[in-house]
Amino acid sequence: MNLLIIITINITLSFILISIAFWLPQMNLYSEKANPYECGFDPTSSARLPFSMKFFLVAITFLLFDLEIALLLPLPWAIQTTNTTTMMATAFILVTILALGLSYEWTQKGLEWTE
């Protein structure tokens, strides 16, 4: 019963905060706030730099493999448990899924900088 109350309160608070964050910024729209500021002068060029999608894909792939390492680091301690078969199967499934994802990314040429 306590868990149900806590979940209800969390969902309600989350909904209220998301609603406030969605509606509050739209109350005051000033065009000056959207412009970049360069010591009172008009900007000479665009303040927004282009973003490389290739870099983004490589960065996301790095984060996935970094997370894999973080998940596999406790394996030496998990080997000491009584149920090593389940632990090894879970680790094998995790590594297999990530290897399949990497091979798919490689075949789709998502890891190459030049086209």
UniProtKB/Swiss-Prot annotation:
Please cite one Gene Ontology biological process associated with this protein.
Answer: response to hormone
Annotated localization: Mitochondrion inner membrane
Principal subcellular localisation of the protein? mitochondrion
UniProt cross-references to Pfam families, sorted A to Z:
Oxidored_q4
Catalyses which reaction(s): a ubiquinone + NADH + 5 H(+)(in) = a ubiquinol + NAD(+) + 4 H(+)(out)
Q: Name one GO cellular component term.
A: mitochondrial inner membrane
- Which keywords accompany this UniProt record? Electron transport, Membrane, Mitochondrion, Mitochondrion inner membrane, NAD, Respiratory chain, Translocase, Transmembrane, Transmembrane helix, Transport, Ubiquinone
Question: EC number(s) of the enzyme?
Answer: 7.1.1.2
Q: Which residues cross the membrane?
A: 3-23, 55-75, 86-106
Q: Which GO terms describe its molecular function?
A: NADH dehydrogenase (ubiquinone) activity
Keyword Electron transport assigned to the entry: answer is: yes
Please give, as recorded in its UniProt entry, the membrane topology of this protein: Multi-pass membrane protein
Source superkingdom: Eukaryota
Quaternary organization: Core subunit of respiratory chain NADH dehydrogenase (Complex I) which is composed of 45 different subunits. Interacts with TMEM186. Interacts with TMEM242.
What does the protein in this record do?
Core subunit of the mitochondrial membrane respiratory chain NADH dehydrogenase (Complex I) which catalyzes electron transfer from NADH through the respiratory chain, using ubiquinone as an electron acceptor. Essential for the catalytic activity of complex I.
Q: Which family does it belong to?
A: Belongs to the complex I subunit 3 family.
What the entry lists under PANTHER family is as follows: NADH-UBIQUINONE OXIDOREDUCTASE CHAIN 3
Could you identify this protein by its name?
Answer: NADH-ubiquinone oxidoreductase chain 3
Task: State the organism of origin.
Answer: Rattus norvegicus (Rat)
